[in-house]
Amino acid sequence: MGRPLAEMAARVPAAMAGAEPGAEAFLACAEAVVPVVGALGVALAPVRVDVGGNVERLRQRRAEDPGRFLSVFDFVRAEKAAGEHASDSGCTKGLLWLLRAMRFLEELIRRVFASREASTYDAATAAYDAVL
């Protein structure tokens, strides 16, 4: 396993410990995905930027009140209570797109390894169609 993948895999258990994913562990795990996406090539630069931007958005919100945002779901609860959960610039949408990107990347990597003859473009197109 390459170094970026190993680093990401090492963070997954901490991110998923407990009934709700811890915010800091989840963000560290998601942040570790950025170099993995970068290693997949220039064609996926928009995904890399999107993942990095959404992680940064969530980190900035958490930094405002770290004691309030202990769980990933605390972001959603806070925005729902304030009536801000539908905002395009909010953490709820950022989290939604971050999770969609993770599903896309998981499917892309699965397809690349399943059929080494397929081009990355074909694998990315099929992954996009499957999960987005």
Task: Give, region by region, the residue ranges found by the protein language model.
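Long, contiguous alpha-helical bundle segments
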Residues: M1-L132
